Regions:
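Transmembrane-helix motifs of polytopic, lipid-linked glycan transferases
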Residues: 94-124, 163
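Membrane-interface transmembrane helices that cradle and orient dolichyl/undecaprenyl
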Residues: 121, 161-175, 207
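Perimembrane helix-loop-helix junctions
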Residues: 192-221
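Short hydrophobic/aromatic helix or loop-helix immediately within or flanking a transmembrane segment
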Residues: 48, 64-93, 155
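Multi-pass, polyprenyl lipid-linked donor-dependent membrane glycosyltransferases
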Residues: 101-104, 132, 140-168, 182-193
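Membrane-helix interface segments
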Residues: 94-97, 122-129, 170-176
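Interfacial juxtamembrane loops and adjacent helix segments
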Residues: 40, 44, 52-77, 117, ...
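Start-transfer (signal-anchor) and selected internal transmembrane alpha helices
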Residues: 1-38, 128
Length: 221
């Protein structure tokens, strides 16, 4: 047991627990618990419509931000989160546990934030401090615990961007660009982020293969 505990990389325990504890305190004061229903569930409604064979929502929801075209009502936000919700809509219908999904996305993000910092920095002993600052010294906390349509897309785009950058630094171009594309499907302005990823991928490949070409990079990665 002692040997097993010595092998545990505790930062991967401390950071998620710190976030979950903070979210619990915020929820206690705000009265917004992660298992509560989500009135702004545009993505669940969109996914449900897809599974029923249509692109529009079938009716108006006055409290949601919808696009109206030829008398039909459509979700006006980028659609990637709706793909993530497919298995949840199959199980729960439109009453998906969006706040819990947002929490899970945030936890995955903080794990990749640790991995990214350790990949990018030589001062690995400071990773706990800087990862906590990334989440606690920004406006992310409210976003990260909230499953409303605007915020869950932000959470997913942030986590997917961290994953894309991590795999870029690991010179895994396929994974990096796949996660980047998913991030763009949450927030289209992240398309500009692709320029940085391609630059870093080419730079990393040239470092490993000084005589390699960009075409070889495309074929290999």
């Amino acid at each position: 047991m002692k040997k097993w505990l010595e092998k545990v990389d505790w930062i991967y325990v401390i950071v998620p627990l710190a976030l979950l504890g903070t979210f619990w305190v915020i929820a206690a004061f705000a009265g917004q618990w992660p298992w509560q229903s989500n009135p702004y569930n545009s993505y669940a409604l969109q996914t449900d419509s897809w599974l029923k064979g249509r692109l529009d929502l079938g009716q108006n929801y006055e409290w949601l931000e919808l696009a109206i075209y030829q008398g039909k009502y459509f979700v006006s936000f980028p659609p990637f989160p709706s793909y993530v919700l497919i298995p949840f809509v199959v199980l729960f219908g439109t009453n998906t546990p969006d706040h819990l999904i947002a929490l899970a996305v945030t936890i995955i993000g903080c794990i990749y934030a640790v991995k990214l910092y350790r990949e990018a920095s030589a001062e690995k002993q400071h990773s706990l401090f800087w990862v906590l600052m990334l989440y606690f010294a920004s406006g992310y906390l409210f976003v990260g615990m909230n499953g409303y349509v605007w915020f869950i897309a932000q959470s997913m785009s942030f986590t997917l961007s961290l994953m894309a950058l991590y795999y870029t630094l690991r010179n895994k171009g396929g994974l990096a660009l796949a996660f980047w594309a998913c991030a763009v499907g949450c927030r289209p302005m992240l398309a500009l982020y692709g320029i940085l990823l391609v630059y870093l991928l080419v730079k990393g490949y040239k470092k490993e293969n000084p005589k390699g070409t960009v075409w070889q990079l495309v074929k290999e990665k």
